[in-house]
């Protein structure tokens, strides 16, 4: 049976809709009362696992899921050993540097050497500032990253931005975009090469369903 890892959160609704176009119905995952972490499609051909977005590539890399949907931001941060099959085009956002609106910094290069930058994207943030040849101290935070500058713990943050509303409501301003991100369809490399669980039958349909 084909197993698909789907991400909790913002990408779930569009991910379910994407597979529904191919006749794989996982709408049960969207029901408010749902507490199941795995569901079968209505025709019994496939199973969906509901996991944290950061864990999708882990399940796919280790073969517990043959397919998954995950944001490009997670792929950049985790660098998993998976096959990237297609950019699905939904879930648009960007990884950006932001500071307090009252600060004098208007680009990442304006930040002082050895300042603190809070982020849950530790690898991406570190790589970005290394490219700038600007030494900074990356402070790992995994919730309410915006509080870093607000409390004075960090001069800046590196975080995902969609509409910018959260930044604005917390007195922060975006000063530089690092990269843009959308949802990607990924596959377990060996399953893809060897057509395990009929994966080769689905992939042309999946990539052809992108609109």
Swiss-Prot record:
<keyword id="KW-0368">Histidine biosynthesis</keyword>
<keyword id="KW-0808">Transferase</keyword>
<comment type="similarity">
    <text>Belongs to the ATP phosphoribosyltransferase family. Short subfamily.</text>
</comment>
<dbReference type="InterPro" id="IPR024893">
    <property type="entry name" value="ATP_PRibTrfase_HisG_short"/>
</dbReference>
<keyword id="KW-0067">ATP-binding</keyword>
<dbReference type="GO" id="GO:0000105">
    <property type="term" value="P:L-histidine biosynthetic process"/>
</dbReference>
<dbReference type="InterPro" id="IPR001348">
    <property type="entry name" value="ATP_PRibTrfase_HisG"/>
</dbReference>
<comment type="pathway">
    <text>Amino-acid biosynthesis; L-histidine biosynthesis; L-histidine from 5-phospho-alpha-D-ribose 1-diphosphate: step 1/9.</text>
</comment>
<dbReference type="GO" id="GO:0003879">
    <property type="term" value="F:ATP phosphoribosyltransferase activity"/>
</dbReference>
<comment type="function">
    <text>Catalyzes the condensation of ATP and 5-phosphoribose 1-diphosphate to form N'-(5'-phosphoribosyl)-ATP (PR-ATP). Has a crucial role in the pathway because the rate of histidine biosynthesis seems to be controlled primarily by regulation of HisG enzymatic activity.</text>
</comment>
<dbReference type="Pfam" id="PF01634">
    <property type="entry name" value="HisG"/>
</dbReference>
<keyword id="KW-0028">Amino-acid biosynthesis</keyword>
<comment type="subunit">
    <text>Heteromultimer composed of HisG and HisZ subunits.</text>
</comment>
<keyword id="KW-0547">Nucleotide-binding</keyword>
<dbReference type="InterPro" id="IPR013820">
    <property type="entry name" value="ATP_PRibTrfase_cat"/>
</dbReference>
<keyword id="KW-0328">Glycosyltransferase</keyword>
<keyword id="KW-0963">Cytoplasm</keyword>
<dbReference type="GO" id="GO:0005524">
    <property type="term" value="F:ATP binding"/>
</dbReference>
<dbReference type="InterPro" id="IPR018198">
    <property type="entry name" value="ATP_PRibTrfase_CS"/>
</dbReference>
<protein>
    <recommendedName>
        <fullName>ATP phosphoribosyltransferase</fullName>
        <ecNumber>2.4.2.17</ecNumber>
    </recommendedName>
</protein>
<dbReference type="GO" id="GO:0005737">
    <property type="term" value="C:cytoplasm"/>
</dbReference>
């Amino acid at each position: 049976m084909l197993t698909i890892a789907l991400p909790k959160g913002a990408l779930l609704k569009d991910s379910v809709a994407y597979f529904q176009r191919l006749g794989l119905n996982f709408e049960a995952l969207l029901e408010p009362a749902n507490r199941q972490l795995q569901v079968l499609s209505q025709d019994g051909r496939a199973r969906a696992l509901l996991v944290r977005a950061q864990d999708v590539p882990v399940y796919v890399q280790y073969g517990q899921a043959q397919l998954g949907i995950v944001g490009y931001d997670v792929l950049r941060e985790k660098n998993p050993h998976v096959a990237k099959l297609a950019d699905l085009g939904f879930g648009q956002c960007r990884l950006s540097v932001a500071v307090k609106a009252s600060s004098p910094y208007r680009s990442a290069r304006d930040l002082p050497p050895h300042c603190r930058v809070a982020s849950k994207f530790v690898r991406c943030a570190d790589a970005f500032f290394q490219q700038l040849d600007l030494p900074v101290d990356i402070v790992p935070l995994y919730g309410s990253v915006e509080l870093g500058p607000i409390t004075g713990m960090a001069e800046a943050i590196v975080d995902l931005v969609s509409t910018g509303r959260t930044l604005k409501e917390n007195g922060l301003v975006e000063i530089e975009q690092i990269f843009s991100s959308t949802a990607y369809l990924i596959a377990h490399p060996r399953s893809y090469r060897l057509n395990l669980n009929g994966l080769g039958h689905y992939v042309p349909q999946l990539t052809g369903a992108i609109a």
